[in-house]
Amino acid sequence: MNRILLFYIFLLACLFSACSFSSKSGIEIERAGNGYKLYIDGRETYIKGVGGTYRLDVATQSGANAFRTWGGTVEEVKKTLTLASENKMYVMQGIGMTKDSIRYYDDAYKDKMREEVRLLAETFKNDTCLLAWGIGNEIELGNANIGAAWRFVEELAQLIKSIDQRHLVSTVISYNPSALDSIAKYVPSLDYVGINVYGPMGEIRQTFEQSDYKGAFMITEWGPTGWWETTSTEWKAPIEQTSEEKRQIYEERYTQHISANPRCLGSFVFLWGQKEERTPTWFSMFVEDNVDQLPLRGEKTPMVEAMQRVWTNKELTETARIIEAMTINHKHAIDNIRLKVGVPFTAQVDVTDKENNSLIYVWEILKEATVLGFGGSYEPRPERVGEVTTSDANTYETTIHTSGNYRLYGYVLDNTGFVSTVNVPFQVINKE
């Protein structure tokens, strides 16, 4: 009797564990009608992924089953796969590659990469939480959209496959039809292509239909409209969407262009965490934590709400506050707001709260970012101007005494664990 009980417990453990074997072992992509399906150990699996390793407990509670990384040593990958096992998730493990085309003619660099890839493949070839290897991320963004680079990606793909027969092999490109055609020409050994796309998400189906590449793909980064794609002020400050506008876009892009595409095996939403890129909030699905004076503790944004809704197909019992707009002196960001040095101004945030909770408003002014990264590389947090203000009022009055380009940030908190965000760029000019 005890043996029978233990047997059924084992079966249940296998059923509910993401990283487990079944009678059919391995990861495969199979043709299905006019698209493709992914099978992990015999189970059809659609990838509901996040970019990054932050708060994976929230990711799984929200319906995610995978996460993506951008690189790592053997020891770092071991830690990553331990995280995956603890959270019952799969990993698309990145392998960092240079964007400098010259290096693809450098034997020393290529030998180094061959050894790194060989060691990774040999070490993790049997790991059941590993989904796929991602060779490089947007290498074509520099000047490496060349045959030599893609031929080396093909060489590394073949090297991995000669060692690791369980896991898939991919590479990741930006939204670049030319790079997609290069992959079709030079890299036939890939199991699927990863593509990072933001604003042109609606063009994805047509792009793949018109491309020479005819295989499966995943959307390996996606999210709000990028700062390079949006409207800017007359002084070139990009205008960021409110968190409510982002929430709507996340849901629309997922349902209309990701899950509805039969060639798409799933996606990794970006960024499941927080980063500085033009602003502290542009791609961040969680807000900052432990910043001096700022009473934020890594709360969830409405984009987390959006993903839970589309992943689970269920409505949430608690939702984020809806920020309708922020104005400065009754003007919107699109109005190219210019203020005078030393003259007080008033900002206002208009909010809808379905649950009628008491709200806390946090106001912060930062200088407009001037130290800018490339391709998502590190950017420092811009300098703060004045003090952070926290109140229960949806209006804020202050004065700037030095000319320059600035951005006013508004955060709306309640007791649900969500925070809604908005910011408006403005310029302060000297009095005539």
What is the predicted role of each segment?
Residues 17-18:
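C-terminal motif of bacterial Sec signal peptides marking the signal peptidase cleavage site
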Residues 422-429:
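C-terminal edge beta-strand
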Residues 1-5:
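Positively charged n-region of N-terminal signal peptides that target proteins for export
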Residues 26, 30-33, 37-190, 196-203, ...:
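Active-site mouth of glycoside hydrolases
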Residues 32-33, 40-49, 209-378, 391, ...:
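Substrate-binding clefts and catalytic carboxylate motifs of secreted carbohydrate-active enzymes
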Residues 353, 390, 396-402:
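Residue-level recognition of secondary-structure-to-loop junctions
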